[in-house]
């Protein structure tokens, strides 16, 4: 747990983030024409897989299996998505804002938990990012897509940046409560700016030969990115 934070507050913030991430998985499942069970599975995967992966890599029992409320939040998100998809579609921009907040929260708390277990700076930053993006990556694998965080959308980078703030502050010997908030703000702001201005990471051009034998190097697409774990509609 982040030092100095009210454990009850952190719990409820994590549950809110779990619910919002569950909406992402549920919407992806509904669009993939999965049945109710499939919707629930994908909602739980997106909501919980990042934290489970982090805890297993650290070597501690996953928090998901020690507190039933995490499973309840993810499952509730799946049921809400299954029953109310049209409503969720209409408020998509609002959900994206909450998702950005969930990503920021999870990367900060994930990095803080790794630091508590005395991991080095690089592993702690990576585990912080995994906490935020791991569920979306597994979701894409289950619906047979290239994980969207591996493409050119700003999703993993903000998570890494937010986690780096927390880990860097700890490495400098600071226990100030300001740094978790700063890490949250960095990740949250980067994510929203990336969405607002469609900021994308560059991709390598691919070579293609024309009928005359000349090499044609196509430009990278100018359209919107496929999105991160929740950047666009899954």
State each model region's role.
Residues 202-227:
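Short, highly charged, low-complexity non-transmembrane loops/tails of multi-pass membrane proteins
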Residues 84, 90-148:
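Membrane-proximal helix-loop-helix units in multi-pass membrane proteins
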Residues 6-18, 41-44, 62-76, 120-132:
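Structural signature of hydrophobic alpha-helical transmembrane segments
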Residues 41-45, 52-58, 126, 130, ...:
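Short, structured motif recognition centered on aromatic/hydrophobic residues
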Residues 1-9, 56-66, 110-123, 168-179:
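Helix-coil boundary and interhelical linker segments in multi-pass alpha-helical membrane proteins
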Residues 43-51, 74, 99-112, 130, ...:
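Small-residue-rich segments of transmembrane alpha-helices in multi-pass membrane proteins
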Residues 37-45, 66-72, 92-103, 123-127, ...:
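Cytoplasmic-side transmembrane-helix entry/capping segments in multi-pass membrane proteins
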Residues 22-32, 52-56, 79-92, 137-148, ...:
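C-terminal ends of transmembrane helices
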């Amino acid at each position: 747990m982040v030092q100095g934070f009210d454990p009850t507050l952190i719990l409820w913030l994590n549950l809110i983030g779990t619910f919002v991430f569950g909406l992402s998985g549920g919407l992806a499942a509904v669009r993939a024409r999965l049945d109710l069970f499939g919707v629930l599975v994908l909602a739980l995967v997106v909501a919980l897989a990042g934290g489970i992966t982090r805890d297993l890599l650290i070597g501690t029992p996953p928090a998901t299996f020690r507190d039933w409320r995490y499973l309840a939040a993810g499952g509730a998100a799946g049921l809400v998505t299954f029953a109310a998809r049209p409503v969720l579609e209409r408020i998509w921009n609002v959900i994206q804002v909450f998702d950005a907040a969930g990503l920021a929260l999870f990367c900060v708390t994930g990095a803080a938990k790794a630091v508590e277990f005395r991991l080095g700076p690089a592993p702690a930053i990576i585990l912080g990012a995994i906490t935020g993006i791991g569920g979306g990556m597994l979701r894409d694998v289950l619906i047979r897509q290239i994980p969207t965080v591996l493409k050119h959308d700003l999703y993993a980078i903000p998570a890494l940046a937010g986690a780096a703030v927390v880990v860097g502050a700890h490495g400098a010997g600071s226990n100030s409560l300001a740094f978790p908030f700063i890490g949250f703000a960095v990740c949250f702001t980067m994510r929203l700016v990336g969405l607002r201005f469609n900021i994308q990471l560059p991709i390598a051009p691919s070579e293609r030969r024309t009928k005359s034998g000349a090499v044609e190097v196509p430009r990278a697409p100018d359209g919107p990115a496929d999105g991160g774990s929740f950047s666009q509609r899954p």
